[in-house]
């Protein structure tokens, strides 16, 4: 057992570990979000202290981003699918792959510890000084959170190096870059973004650490520092990070839509690759749109508004190419396809509210209101999460060699769809009416939509529990698929289900008939 799970060098086993870890962290993060909605579900105090409330909000963000979405998308799907799609026997650095995983549990432990010592880190996930300084947040909490981020960051950087090396060096003959599957492209672009952005975050939080403990003044005006410098450094990481969260999802959705449409390739395959490259590049030059309210020059604001809107172009190319891939097909309403439809629709809605927020003048009013919360939860809670659900339902027979009950999956999708929309759609109204983020209480005039929102979160929770039940039922009954349900658009399906522990003992050769 310890040989297989503790010291594993097998990409499939490590991928499975990532899935289990991500699912566990996801349950912790979901519990925190239920606490947030319980607090906001009625006027007056429930938990009481705003510090505790902000600790919950901060932990919810960190856990969902660094310990749920990234481990599942990059660690789980990436590890499982990239070697299979490339025809590679494993990742380029199998032991480093294992180390990448085993840095995450200690990292999560440090994050949880930060909530339990002193008063917790109630800084929001951005950890802005002076709130995160040694005066406003005395004690070890923020320091523990910083070390947690360091560990998670090292884990991601090592993983990124591994994926980039694997894709450069371990492709089978015949898989040229232009014929490489879109999911592999999405993962390698994600890896480059991680490699370039995480060191900047590491620098920023290390400077914060020395400001707190070693008497430096990087972010303290009293010593000639500037807290705005921290914001620039953080968001130079933070904005690429949101594209890191969604890009692997783009790759998965491309595969699912292509395969379920019965097409042999995605519409505009090369355009899709260039669109992802453009999104990755542009993601680095728009960071200050998170800072429209800190007092930048008007020409700076004009630039960041324009650059942010340009990102909508490659994103639009992807949306319309997915629709074009669907064009002319007999639509199948399989569970994976339902998730993909939900993704395309809701991600588009989230993208549109993003274009609204890109206008610096409008953002002055909407900044730090629930409109922003609604925007990023539409692209994360219904973009990233729907992509994860789509990918899991689609590749579940490959991962386990079992099938889930499709009728139940469709019911579960419907419940989840209603739940997330009921949770986050009303938040647009709250934001437009001026309800601010990160407060545990609110004027009674905001009550109705907050009650609706909290009701939606309960429905979503039920949907997630139902999904866990469906997986459990599938594993108990052990229904095996007789054969893959559709013609494959990618080579990972040309295996036994699940694949043998060591696939591609002999290098596959891909010809033009592929």
From Swiss-Prot:
Domain of life of the native organism = Eukaryota
Question: What does the record's cofactor remark say about binding?
Answer: Binds 2 heme A groups non-covalently per subunit. Binds a copper B center.
How this chain sits in the membrane, per its record, is: Multi-pass membrane protein
Q: In which pathway does it act?
A: Energy metabolism; oxidative phosphorylation
> Which amino acids does the record list as binding O2?
243
Q: Which cofactor does it need?
A: heme; Cu cation
**Protein family according to the UniProt entry:** Belongs to the heme-copper respiratory oxidase family.
Protein name stated in the entry: Cytochrome c oxidase subunit 1
UniProt organism field? Anopheles gambiae
Give the gene symbol. COI
